[in-house]
From Swiss-Prot:
PANTHER family: 12S RRNA N4-METHYLCYTIDINE METHYLTRANSFERASE (PTHR11265:SF0), S-ADENOSYL-METHYLTRANSFERASE MRAW (PTHR11265). The gene is rsmH. GO terms for biological process: rRNA base methylation. InterPro entries: RsmH, SAM-dep_MeTrfase_MraW_recog, SAM-dependent_MTases_sf. This is Ribosomal RNA small subunit methyltransferase H. Specifically methylates the N4 position of cytidine in position 1402 (C1402) of 16S rRNA. It holds the Pfam family Methyltransf_5. Its main location: cytoplasm. It catalyses: cytidine(1402) in 16S rRNA + S-adenosyl-L-methionine = N(4)-methylcytidine(1402) in 16S rRNA + S-adenosyl-L-homocysteine + H(+). The lineage of its organism: Bacteria, Pseudomonadati, Pseudomonadota, Betaproteobacteria, Burkholderiales. The keyword Glycoprotein does not apply.
């Protein structure tokens, strides 16, 4: 197994033991780590697997892929794609069913801590925000063309920012000055534009937090891809297989919670119809529960404070 790299030393995997314990129910199973990151969960899963077990991991980030490629364990494979391609990737590998799917959502510490990636408002850097900088539209490119309405909707819906319209107008006004000032291409300037608009302050939170989150989610299509992978995971899980999802903000957690609840409930029917409960199809999932980081983990890793892990098990064939 590969030694830790510098970025791995900086990255503390949240809910490491709890997630792997919930995920791995059989040592000979086929498991999916939808978000390899720097490999914390994947390495522990491999420790739990027997010789016939298998782990397939996904990540968009080229740096994560480079780390994963150092793992020479024959039971391990890495896919340089979004976890939204889960169904296709499994079909290409001849995998019909899996024993568990783990998703550790959001941005990783190495991504946030590297100003060159453009995720952070705390250090100036290029306004990129792509999980995979080699594909798709950067944040700067999108901000250079988005309308006030588009900006407002993204910042409001994905950032839950009540000053979304005012921020959108300020961004478009800044764009009108591009001939004189040049294009908006730095995280520092974006953060300052937002700070000039958001006059009220949330305790312990930078005024740019919500806007940066919103733009990042939009650029990477995070919520849409989450919906896709949840459906794919449900279709691939074998009976007794586990779906384990760690989320870090309410938008993600709400999607996961509603998905699990919807598939753990018996369909509602009109009570006036002559249908017996035993005639209704069994729900495919059973909700195992949710887990929060311990006080000790939060003290050691403040990022864990907002983490919520939800676990469900496939009970119907």
């Amino acid at each position: 197994m590969a030694p830790a790299m510098g970025n791995e030393l900086q990255h503390r995997t949240v809910l490491l033991e709890e997630a792997v314990q919930a995920l791995v129910t059989r040592a000979d199973g086929v498991y999916v780590d939808g978000t390899f990151g720097r490999g914390g969960h994947s390495r522990l899963v491999l420790e739990k697997l027997g010789e016939s077990g298998r782990l397939i991991a996904f990540d968009k980030d080229p740096l994560a892929i480079a780390t994963a490629q150092q793992i020479t364990d024959p039971r391990f494979g890495i896919v340089h794609e979004s976890f939204a391609s889960l169904r296709t990737a499994m079909a290409e590998r001849g995998v019909g069913r899996v024993s568990g799917v783990l998703l550790d959502l959001g941005v990783s510490s190495p991504q946030v801590d590297d100003p060159e990636r453009g995720f952070s408002f705390r250090a100036d850097g290029p306004l990129d925000m792509r999980m995979d900088p080699t594909r798709g539209e950067s944040a700067a490119d999108w901000l250079a063309r988005a309308t006030v309405q588009e900006l407002t909707e993204v910042i409001r819906d994905y950032g839950e920012e009540r000053f979304a319209f005012q921020i959108a107008k300020a961004l478009v006004a800044r764009r009108a000055e591009s001939d004189r000032l040049g294009p908006l291409v730095s995280t520092g300037e974006l953060a300052q534009i937002v700070a000039n608009v958001v006059k009220t302050r949330e305790k312990g939170k930078d005024p740019a937090t919500r806007t940066f989150q919103a733009i990042r989610i939009h650029i990477n299509q995070e919520l849409a891809e989450l919906q896709v992978v949840l459906e794919a995971a449900l279709s691939l899980l074998e009976q007794g297989g586990r779906l384990v999802v760690i989320s870090f903000h309410s938008l993600e957690d709400r999607i996961v919670k509603r998905f699990m609840q919807a598939h753990a409930s018996t369909p509602a029917v009109d009570r006036r119809l002559p249908i017996r409960a035993v005639d209704l199809p069994s729900p495919p999932l059973k909700i195992i529960g949710r887990v929060f980081a311990s006080d000790a983990e939060v003290a050691a890793n403040p990022r864990a404070r907002s983490a919520v892990m939800r676990v469900a098990e496939r009970i119907a064939p």
